[in-house]
Amino acid sequence: MPVASEEDIVRAICTDKWDGQRAAPSLFKGENTSVSRLAVIPLADHWDLFRKHVENPPERRLEFIGEINVGQLQKIGRGYGDPTELTVEPKPEDWNPAHAEIPQKISRGLANQIVRALKIHPPPNEVLHSARK
């Protein structure tokens, strides 16, 4: 059963997907895109979770967490030039019971629109550098 449109999901934004000013479209391009559900694990707890299981220092460090509402994601997909019906499917993992996937293939153009709609969360208790604003 797909994740409800009222839920919010997050995705780790690591240095390989961040150009210093914005997230790269490759963050969402492709199929079976991994996300995590805030209804299962709160945002504050995702920082440690992503640092332990997504980060791969020194070349891949967690910079930010991007958040989007599932309904907003679906609206972006339906409104895209080549309409795409996006769903978020729960796929719990041992390391992340909040893990889910967007199974549909997302084009670079659609991924660009999704990335622009993300709410970007900086690490807790850290001041953003001017280049990150």
Residue ranges and their predicted role:
Residues 1-5, 17-18, 23-133:
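Conserved NAD+-utilizing ADP-ribose enzyme module
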Residues 9-13, 17:
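Betabetaalpha-Me/HNH-type nuclease active-site subdomain
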